[in-house]
Amino acid sequence: MSAAVWQDGEDIILKLYIQPKASRDKIVGLHGEELKIAITAPPVDGKANAHLTK
C-alpha cells in the first residue's frame, strides 16, 4: 500500500488532500503522499466537509 492508504488492524486509513470548488467530484490520484479528492462544494460553513462525507 502507498503512504496515502494503509491498514491499522481492521481499519483502513486514508490520508486525503481535498480540493474544494472543483468543476466536478472525482478522485484525482496521488498528491505527494496523499490521495487527492476534488469536490464541487465550497469551503464555507462546513459545506465541503458535509459534501465529502456523503
From Swiss-Prot:
A Pfam family the protein falls into: DUF167
Protein name (record): UPF0235 protein in proC 3'region
Family (UniProt): Belongs to the UPF0235 family.
Classification lineage: Bacteria, Pseudomonadati, Pseudomonadota, Gammaproteobacteria, Vibrionales
NCBIfam families in the cross-refs: DUF167 family protein (TIGR00251)
Species this protein is from: Vibrio alginolyticus
Lineage: superkingdom: Bacteria
